Structures are given as structure tokens and as C-alpha cells.
Amino acid sequence: MKEGIHPNYREVVFQDMSSDFSFITRSTIQTKDTIVKDGKEYPLAKIEVSSESHPFYTGTQKIMDTAGRVEKFRQKFGNKLGKAAK
């Protein structure tokens, strides 16, 4: 293999921001954040959904509005529901 053309493959901590679940795996992701886990410093990749918080894996239905989409929809359309929706 050629030297210097491949990304750095290293151990990274992925942290689920909705459930505070984290796991260590190997990745080439580039991050500026770091975290100390098990006495060692790792790069930190923040994710919104993992197997610990996804409804398919947990079996529970949960509304996750991380980007404010529901409020944006309500501001745009308000309570203008049709007769069929009531």
C-alpha cells in the first residue's frame, strides 16, 4: 500500500446523545472532540441515534425532535386540521 494516502484508522468512542450510551469501535471519522474512557483518551463522535435509542431495537415508540421540526410544522400550519383528521 502507498504511504500517506489512507485515512487514520483508530479507536473512536461513539456516544448516543439521546441516551448517553457510548461504545468504542475502530473508525476513520475525523473529530475534534475527545473523551476519557477507561483511563484512556479517545476521539469522540456524537451521534443522535444508536441501537440503544432506536425504536426498532428498543421496542418502544419515542418522539425524537432534535431539529425542531414539529414546532416548525405547527408554526407553519397551526391547528388547521381537516374534518377527516378530527
Swiss-Prot record:
- Say yes or no: keyword Ribosomal protein present: yes
Q: Which GO terms describe its biological process?
A: translation
Q: Which GO terms describe its molecular function?
A: structural constituent of ribosome
Question: Has keyword Ribosomal protein?
Answer: yes
Q: Which keywords, in A-to-Z order, does the entry hold?
A: Ribonucleoprotein, Ribosomal protein
Residues of the signal peptide: none
Task: State the family it belongs to.
Answer: Belongs to the bacterial ribosomal protein bL31 family. Type B subfamily.
Q: Mind telling me what this protein is named?
A: Large ribosomal subunit protein bL31B
| Organism for this UniProt entry | Cupriavidus taiwanensis (strain DSM 17343 / BCRC 17206 / CCUG 44338 / CIP 107171 / LMG 19424 / R1) (Ralstonia taiwanensis (strain LMG 19424))
- Where is the organism placed in the taxonomic lineage, from the top? Bacteria, Pseudomonadati, Pseudomonadota, Betaproteobacteria, Burkholderiales
